[in-house]
Amino acid sequence: MNTIYPVIWSNNKVLLIDQTSLPSRYTLVEISRYEDMAKAIKTMIVRGAPAIGVAAAYGMYLGARDIQTQDRETFLKHLDKIAQILRQTRPTAVNLFWAISRMLKTAYETLGTVEEIKKILLETAQKIQEEDLQTCQAIGHNSLSILPTNPEKLTILTHCNAGALATAGYGTALGVIRSVWTAGRLNRVFADETRPRLQGAKLTAWECVQEKIPVTVISDNMAAHCMQKGLIDMVVVGADRIAANGDTANKIGTYGLAVIAKMHQVPFYVAAPLSTVDFSLETGDLIPIEERDPSELYQIGNTVIYPDGVDYYNPAFDVTPADLITGIITEQKTVNPKELITLKG
């Protein structure tokens, strides 16, 4: 198995796989300032809720490292400002806010000198990264107990990229697929291309190719046809934020996929760590939905493909109601969305 780590701590700086360059070029971007990390998150050089959380944690440390004061209160005030800048990068991904809050909590609760706080912050960022990798592996393992018994080898449809590139490594939805592949139960992956940024075609397909997992890319509007023809045995997607009732925000197009799966009685699972669950939100109606630049819709490379005078609407996410979700696969266990609240720590 080829190991893919989108966020790497090396020689006192962060290396990010530039996901905007894949699959044509594999490029590492060096990040040594928190401002550059904020830009990398905003421009989706690093993307996927868990990976964003890991990147933000390192961003907090990079910012803390550069604060030039030995006064604890002054240091913490500067750190609060850094946190606010990082929070503004991607509003839907709850792991971003979770990781930043954890880093701030660590700083405020650490007694000692400013230099000691900085040291603990680096250790905390590394711990967040290590924990996420272990969590993804646990999600993959837990999925094996809920697989349909027939057929023996399953064809799984996924949307966007919830793989190693979207996490600390291994992946959530693609982590499930990796585990099913390793267990000998996978026939093939169907990857929605995932308009407008094509994360399925570019990133999920790339990850599968790296590990020689059979993958077929389809356009988003082919999913219904594939289910109608009996080509899909189950659907597994990731999540950017899950409300307490199980409503799930994920890449735009996920909701439609869930409706189609319900129509054709295809099991529809969400794979996500508990850090993606926002228990403070009762329902998905309260999840903020990021809207991105319309150029993602009308431009391919430097070429504008639609006529002048057209208006655009480009939400990055939609919310799938809990009653369309068969189960949520977490690092603890798989639960019915209505039972998600029982896993609250």
Curated annotation (Swiss-Prot):
Q: What domain of life does the UniProt record list for this protein's source?
A: Bacteria
Residues given in the record as substrate binding sites: R47, G48, A49, R90, Q199, N250, K251
* Pathways per UniProt: Amino-acid biosynthesis; L-methionine biosynthesis via salvage pathway; L-methionine from S-methyl-5-thio-alpha-D-ribose 1-phosphate: step 1/6
Please tell me whether the keyword Magnesium is annotated for this protein: no
Which reaction is catalysed here? 5-(methylsulfanyl)-alpha-D-ribose 1-phosphate = 5-(methylsulfanyl)-D-ribulose 1-phosphate
Keywords associated with the record: Amino-acid biosynthesis, Isomerase, Methionine biosynthesis
Q: Name one Pfam family in it.
A: IF-2B
List this protein's GO terms for biological process: L-methionine salvage from methylthioadenosine
- Enzymatic class: isomerase
Ranges in a coiled coil: none
Might you give the EC number(s) for this enzyme? 5.3.1.23
- InterPro entries, per database record: IF-2B-related (IPR000649), IF-M1Pi (IPR005251), IF_2B-like_C (IPR042529), Initiation_fac_2B_a/b/d (IPR011559), M1Pi_N (IPR027363), NagB/RpiA_transferase-like (IPR037171)
> Where do the catalytic residues lie?
D240
Q: Name one GO molecular function term.
A: S-methyl-5-thioribose-1-phosphate isomerase activity
* Annotated positions for site Transition state stabilizer: C160
Role description? Catalyzes the interconversion of methylthioribose-1-phosphate (MTR-1-P) into methylthioribulose-1-phosphate (MTRu-1-P).
Question: Family, per the entry?
Answer: Belongs to the eIF-2B alpha/beta/delta subunits family. MtnA subfamily.
Question: How is this protein named in the record?
Answer: Methylthioribose-1-phosphate isomerase
Upper lineage is: Bacteria, Bacillati, Cyanobacteriota, Cyanophyceae, Oscillatoriophycideae
Q: Which gene encodes it?
A: mtnA
